[in-house]
């Protein structure tokens, strides 16, 4: 199959691919810049690299350049601690990291995009698009000179089953999982999203979710597959986002529930040109749904995972009006079912489809991931008689705070290393701003202050993973067989 960017440059070349409000690149511009950079990246002779990047045009050029150079990209969450980053990259044998942000990480070759000279001036697209020319630099006048050189021609096609990206589902002190996402996975996800949500070449999608998350990267894949425009924003600011929505004819936007709430507080009381507001990353409250629908905002609730290359369940405004607790129905190209439902119809959600990963890169010895071709999500769900899916527990122990997945095991492991703590458990605590925040229960015979615990945990965990609430207890609730009863700790 032809690279999607190559195809768009040929067929949709003058359409705006990406803009940050100051600078815009057509699909031809984007392909040209990515091709130039790809040739530079080939010199590093790496088949897999880490990316430490922001939401910027340069980061998007870098992503496409890696793919044109047949390099797999491992996305690094920029909020992680250095040790967390090291452990993730080492687990998948990454030695080199390209970055668009300052980074110091011992034991790795760090290459800033600013240090790679690749930007051209006035280069014709003809040679690139018919794949007959190489690009070389004439250092005497700092211009780019097309030159026939078949030995260094970039591939314009790719294998759908090659790995495109790698993302991690959790931190690294606890059980981490490296998810390989193939081009086929991304393509199937994009097609499913198009059918269940809807977009076309006239779409103008505002993307503010981090590119290192599947929710951010998936927007870029949908764009290059379909040929629409992405308005990239690096940081969320409600006033700025609302201004962009009003003034730049934004048709689509991806948000987590709290950011939608902030936008409504800022004055998003009508849809303007918005056709679709795609929500995910945390449960929607009934109040948020009611308020948004009163403003006639086109909200679409969704559910997806890193392992499924973003959403595979989508709820339309009509569905949310009928059942506010639903995450909707599955995309047409996936199949879902409930494993071992109880008398209430609740059981583990299983999914099968081309959007689902083939298996984890790390650890390699996991069992029970798939059953008869269905991926075991670990989420407790129900499918009602109309086909609506309700998610009751997102992997039960998982804490979802502001769209970030936090695994209690990682926090507990670090906490138990604190002098004087004999046992600890972390659960999600309700929070008006973030949905949930971590709360740590610990057993100790010593007097340990909250400040001491925060200082210690902050040395080992990313800031958003550090518990916001602490409670000292005499014992933790275990069953007679030694199983921790976390449900007894879920209280306000």
Curated annotation (Swiss-Prot):
SUPFAM superfamilies in alphabetical order: Acetyl-CoA synthetase-like
Enzyme Commission designation: 6.2.1.26
Top-level taxon in the UniProt lineage: Bacteria
Enzyme class: ligase
CDD domains: OSB_CoA_lg
Any Pfam family the entry gives: AMP-binding_C
InterPro entries the UniProt entry points to: AMP-bd_C, AMP-bd_C_sf, AMP-dep_synth/lig_dom, ANL_N_sf, ATP-dep_AMP-bd_enzyme, MenE
Pathway: Quinol/quinone metabolism; 1,4-dihydroxy-2-naphthoate biosynthesis; 1,4-dihydroxy-2-naphthoate from chorismate: step 5/7; Quinol/quinone metabolism; menaquinone biosynthesis
Keywords: ATP-binding, Ligase, Menaquinone biosynthesis, Nucleotide-binding
UniProt GO BP: menaquinone biosynthetic process
Reactions that this protein is recorded to catalyse: 2-succinylbenzoate + ATP + CoA = 2-succinylbenzoyl-CoA + AMP + diphosphate
An example Gene Ontology molecular-function term: ATP binding
Functional summary from the UniProt entry: Converts 2-succinylbenzoate (OSB) to 2-succinylbenzoyl-CoA (OSB-CoA).
Family assignment from sequence similarity: Belongs to the ATP-dependent AMP-binding enzyme family. MenE subfamily.
Protein name listed in UniProt: 2-succinylbenzoate--CoA ligase
Species name: Staphylococcus aureus (strain MSSA476)
């Amino acid at each position: 199959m032809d690279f999607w960017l190559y195809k768009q440059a040929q067929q949709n070349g003058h359409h705006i691919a990406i803009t940050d409000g100051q600078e815009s690149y057509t699909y031809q511009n984007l392909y040209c810049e990515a091709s130039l950079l790809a040739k530079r990246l080939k010199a590093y002779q790496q088949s897999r690299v880490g990316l430490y990047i922001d939401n910027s045009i340069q980061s998007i050029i870098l992503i496409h350049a890696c793919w044109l150079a047949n390099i797999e990209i491992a996305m690094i969450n920029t909020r992680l601690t250095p040790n967390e980053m090291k452990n993730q990259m080492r687990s998948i044998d990454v030695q080199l990291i390209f970055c668009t942000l300052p980074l110091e990480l011992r034991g790795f070759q760090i290459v800033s995009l600013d240090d790679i000279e690749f930007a051209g001036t006035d280069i014709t697209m003809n040679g690139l698009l018919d794949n007959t020319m190489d690009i070389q630099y004439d250092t005497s006048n700092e211009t780019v000179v097309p030159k026939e050189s078949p030995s260094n021609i970039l591939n314009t096609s790719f294998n759908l089953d090659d790995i495109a990206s790698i993302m991690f589902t959790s931190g690294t002190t606890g059980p981490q999982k490296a998810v390989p996402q193939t081009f086929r996975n991304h393509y199937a996800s994009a097609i499913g999203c198009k059918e269940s949500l809807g977009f076309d070449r006239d779409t103008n999608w505002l993307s503010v979710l981090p590119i290192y998350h599947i929710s951010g990267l998936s927007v870029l894949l949908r764009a290059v597959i379909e040929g629409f425009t992405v308005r990239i924003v690096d940081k969320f600011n409600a006033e700025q986002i609302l201004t962009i929505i009003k003034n730049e004819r934004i048709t689509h936007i991806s948000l987590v529930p709290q950011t939608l709430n902030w936008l409504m507080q800022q004055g998003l009381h009508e849809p303007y040109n918005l056709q679709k507001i795609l929500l995910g990353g945390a449960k929607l409250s009934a109040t948020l749904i009611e308020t948004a629908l009163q403003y006639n905002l086109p909200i679409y609730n969704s559910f997806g995972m890193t392992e499924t290359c973003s959403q595979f369940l989508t709820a339309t405004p009509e569905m949310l009006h009928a059942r506010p607790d639903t995450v909707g129905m599955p995309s047409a190209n996936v199949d879902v079912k409930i494993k071992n439902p109880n008398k209430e119809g609740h059981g583990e959600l299983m999914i099968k489809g081309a959007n689902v990963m083939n298996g984890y890169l790390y650890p390699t010895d996991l069992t029970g991931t798939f059953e008869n071709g269905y991926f075991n999500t670990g989420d407790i769900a129900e499918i009602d008689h109309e086909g609506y899916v309700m998610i009751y527990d997102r992997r039960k122990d998982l804490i979802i705070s502001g769209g970030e997945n936090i695994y209690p095991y990682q926090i507990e492991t670090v906490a138990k290393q604190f002098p004087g703590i004999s046992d600890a458990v972390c659960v999600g605590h309700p929070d008006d701003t973030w949905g949930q925040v971590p709360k740590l229960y610990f057993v100790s015979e010593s007097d340990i202050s909250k400040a001491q615990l925060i200082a210690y945990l902050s040395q080992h965990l990313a800031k958003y993973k550090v518990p916001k609430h602490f409670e000292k207890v005499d014992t933790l609730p275990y069953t007679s067989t030694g199983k921790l009863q976390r449900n007894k700790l879920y209280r306000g």
